[in-house]
C-alpha cells in the first residue's frame, strides 16, 4: 500500500473543506455569523440599557452626593402626577445615533472620574458652571429634545397655565426659543450665574 492510498489527516480534510466553498461551509459560516451577531447585539443592548439607568448614573459619589441630592428635591423626582424623569430621560437622547454620540462624549466625564477632577464638593463647585454650560449648549443644539419627549409647545394648553407662564410660553414660540433658554436649573442647583445670560 503506497502513500497515495492513505486517507488524508483530519487537519488536511478540514483545510480542504474550508478552502473548497460548499453550501455546507457557507451555511455554517452564515449561521456562525448570525448567532455571533445576535450574541454581540444582545450583549451590546444589555450594556447600553444598564448604562441608561439612574442607578448607573449615581454609582459614583460625585453624582450621588451632589446633583442627585438636588434632583431629589425637584419636581422631576417627586410631583403630583407620579411621573418621574430619571437622569437618562434628561441627559441621554432616545434615538440611537445621538445616544451613541452622547455616550462617546461621556468618556470625558469618565476621565474626570478617574483622575479626580470633581471628586470633592469644592472641586465639583469649581467646575459646576462649565459642566452646566456644556449641558445647556447640548440641549440648545438639539432643541431641548429630551425635554420635548415629555413637554411640547404644540400640546400645551396655555389657557390652563398661570397667566405669566402662558405669556412666556407664547413668546418663546414666537421667538423660536427652546426649553433650556428659560428653564436652566430645573432639576439641579444653578452654578454662580454672574457670567450667564438670564433666562426670564
UniProtKB/Swiss-Prot annotation:
Might you name a Gene Ontology BP term for this protein? anaerobic respiration
Does the record bear Hydrolase in its keywords?
A: no
- At which positions is substrate bound? 103
Q: How is it modified after translation?
A: Binds 4 heme groups per subunit.
Task: State the compartments where it is located.
Answer: Cell inner membrane
Principal subcellular localization: membrane
The family note in this entry says: Belongs to the NapC/NirT/NrfH family.
Protein name per Swiss-Prot or TrEMBL? Cytochrome c-type protein NapC
What is the originating organism of this protein?
A: Escherichia coli (strain K12)
Its organism's taxonomic lineage begins at: Bacteria, Pseudomonadati, Pseudomonadota, Gammaproteobacteria, Enterobacterales
